[in-house]
Regions:
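Non-catalytic structural scaffold of enzyme domains
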Residues: 1-164
Length: 164
């Protein structure tokens, strides 16, 4: 059973600063919550790393967040979600809630694009993991997913290109 306290912070992490957009959405929707954001710019980008390396990085980040008694950990990185979500579920156990960024995207697609063709760009790891295809096929929502690995995506996001 989870032993969470309402006044404990929410922990959010990403391989860099791109997850700050998700952190902002959390702040906008939950303005009374405190938050700890961890941007792992030391190992940026995750998308070209091995699954084992990413799992090691995120285990250290999760330890850092758990030491600060977060009640919820939000993985704001698609590559980390693809590589480590299941491992982190087991690792964290009942010490905190765990949320990834892939499941909400799948839910949105299934509710709004069933029977349609959808394009997906992502890191090499995210695309090669097949996680989006797997989750879409489990829902049987007939989405024709066209996925393309885009190596320059992370540098573009990290440089703030979309803000200009």
């Amino acid at each position: 059973m989870l032993n969470l306290k309402a006044d404990h912070p929410i922990g959010i992490f990403d391989s860099g600063v791109g997850g700050l957009t998700i952190a902002k959405a959390v702040i906008d929707n939950l303005p009374n919550e405190s938050m700890i954001y961890f941007g792992d710019t030391k190992h940026l980008p995750y998308g070209d790393k091995s699954i084992q390396a990413i799992q090691g990085y995120v285990r250290e980040i999760v330890d850092f967040l758990l030491e600060r008694e977060v009640k919820l950990i939000l993985i704001a990185c698609h590559s980390a979600s693809a590589a480590a979500y299941e491992m982190l579920q087991n690792y964290i156990g009942n010490r905190a809630l765990l949320v990834n960024v892939i499941d909400p995207v799948i839910k949105f697609l299934s509710e709004n694009y069933a029977g349609k063709r959808v394009g997906l760009i992502g890191t090499k790891l995210t695309i090669q993991s097949g996680i989006y295809h797997k989750k879409i096929s489990e829902l049987e929502c007939q989405i024709d997913l066209c996925a393309l690995a885009t190596p320059l995506l992370v540098p573009i996001i990290e440089e703030g290109f979309f803000e200009h």
